[in-house]
Amino acid sequence: MDKQQEFVIRTLEERDIRFVRLWFTDVLGFLKSVAVAPAELEQAFDEGIGFDGSAIEGFARVYESDMIAKPDPSTFQVLPWRAEAPGTARMFCDILMPDGSPSFADPRYVLKRALARTSDLGFTFYTHPEIEFFLLKDKPVDGSVPTPADNSGYFDHTPQNIGMDFRRQAITMLESMGISVEFSHHEGAPGQQEIDLRYADALSTADNVMTFRLVMKQVALEQGLQATFMPKPFSEYPGSGMHTHLSLFEGDRNAFYESGAEYQLSKVGRSFIAGLLRHAAEISAVTNQWVNSYKRIWGGTERTAGAGGEAPSYICWGHNNRSALVRVPMYKPGKTGSARVEVRSIDSGANPYLTYAVLLAAGLKGIEEGYELPPGAEDDVWALSDAERRALGIEPLPQNLGEALALMERSDLVAETLGEHVFDFFLRNKRQEWEEYRSQVTAFELRKSLPVL
């Protein structure tokens, strides 16, 4: 055993931990778990735990279903809601084939593969997500309209703000697991919260996002609430995004920073943004993977909701412009390490492993191909007419999942990044979701048409 594995075994004994949950995600980003006893963990480190891959969305067909979950000891943490003895801990797993080779179906491996290519180019990829979600009073039944847990608004600090106690307990849990939080506050809509995680390497951040979602749901359950990461659960309120700040480092140097350049943004940073823009439409099915995702992007309320409700609809960048798809935040003098770009289209229901992989691939393509960055958007992009946007070369994002899938299907970049297995399954699964949605007769249609037609 190596030192990390020895630390895990020793901690289990010292803290009387009786269960270890081994976590991984399916292709769509749903968390999976298998529990093992501490006595089995040494063998799990050596050989992994076998399971039926055909039972996991997108993993394997029934006639080739044997797969192995091998725990990554660097991700070991004690679960804070099982802190009383005997306790429970968790580790994320890498998914392997029976011969020990990585499974191409594993979203974590998709990101690892992209990060390995990044490392070969001399870069380290860092991400920092701002995660929005709603707290609901109770679980809606049979598609009924949900009820927000409070009526507070952006940055509100009021006695009836249920979110304050919720966020305090949730952040305490996160930090006890080594997940650092930068900020938290009430967002713009009733019941809507935002918690921002501190910068970390992209793989750690993706693991942290998955942990974050479970912690939020666990704390909500304990408080008699429901936490949802659905992109847009309310027609009348802004949706929930996962705006993510990205940066590349070469060793200790921020590759996006250049003293004296416009916005202190280096050529590497400019080409990275150009890559994000050029490939934005074709990666949208990954960054915004649900039918409901496009209600957030094109829902209308985003444009008038004020603070916290600015979901981008058009492909452009801007300096400190929150109507743009990619924002270059204001540079803080003396803080060269803080140079970064913010991608604002991602929603809270995205699979973070696949999302970070395609964002990275798009940005690196811009660097490798020397893409030129178009002029930035200086105005409120939503306030422009279609003709004005066309004159500026500003194109729209896909308007629905069907459009996004058609663009993804033709994308060599997405196919290469996800790999054939994940790419094919993702398209099949999402086409089915789109067709099921298109065939529904909605409450809107019945309300508008049934009485008069």
Curated annotation (Swiss-Prot):
Q: What class of enzyme is it?
A: ligase
Using the record's annotation, list all stretches that form the GS catalytic domain.
Answer: 107-453
Q: What induces it?
A: Expression is induced by exogenous putrescine, cadaverine and spermidine, but not with glutamine. Expression is also induced under starvation conditions with concomitant low glucose and ammonium levels, but not by high ammonium or glutamine level. Transcriptionally regulated by acetylated GlnR.
- Which annotated residues bind L-glutamate? 239, 296, 310, 322, 344
Database matches in Gene3D superfamilies: Glutamine synthetase, N-terminal domain, Glutamine synthetase/guanido kinase, catalytic domain
**Function (record text):** Involved in the catabolism of polyamines. Catalyzes the ATP-dependent gamma-glutamylation of polyamines. Substrates include putrescine, cadaverine, spermidine and spermine, with a preference for short-chain polyamine putrescine. No complementation of the L-glutamine auxotrophy of an E.coli glnA mutant. Together with GlnA3, enables survival of S.coelicolor under exposure to high local environmental polyamine concentrations, which is toxic to the cells.
What is the name attached to this protein's record?
A: Gamma-glutamylpolyamine synthetase GlnA2
